[in-house]
């Protein structure tokens, strides 16, 4: 495992830049963004709008379920980032919510004071000093960076569903998760002005930095950047 980690960093750190605003593929990224927008407008958004009409308690339960599936990924990456205390917290959350919380549909752990964290292998690479590389807009999957794109196979391997379900069920779960996430963003478009591509890019980069730094020293910059795009 340690050899794998060393090779992974050695190969990719040689060409991943730490430049936070690099977008050398902007022309291609914008075309991909347009494709994603059309897909969203014609399929994802209508489904998300239908989902928004579900009873709040059901939506909360579904959100809790998918949050619980991410706990194992977070637990492993907390360990890789040298955060043993947080990793124990996250593993405990997973055990409690999976058992007492009926498969994760009820967030019992939060009710007893166990705070939820979100970590992935992309953040772990950042903590290890691997630069983010250029900004990339992925078809269907949306905004990313080269570092986060290369980290996806590891994150997929750490996914609970990767090991516990058939491929078609795994795909179905990912689809439901995407719709659940999209439903939370309904209405944001009406608050934006200017170049939506730039907004999405800046929002993604700022959110990524916020997660990497655990919210330290980036919140004010994030708010200032978002103000530039919001309609008065």
Which residues does each PLM region occupy?
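Positively charged n-region of N-terminal signal peptides that target proteins for export
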Residues: 1-5
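N-terminal signal peptide c-region/cleavage motif recognized by signal peptidases
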Residues: 11-17
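A structured, mid-to-C-terminal "fold-capping" secondary-structure block
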Residues: 20, 128-232
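Short N-terminal segments immediately surrounding and downstream of signal-peptide cleavage
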Residues: 20-34
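Amphipathic, well-ordered alpha-helical segments in soluble domains
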Residues: 38, 42-46, 68-75
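Membrane interface segments of multi-pass transport proteins and intramembrane proteases
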Residues: 42-60, 122
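Beta-rich strand-turn-strand
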Residues: 62-65
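Mid-length scaffold segments of soluble, non-membrane domains
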Residues: 68, 75, 81-143
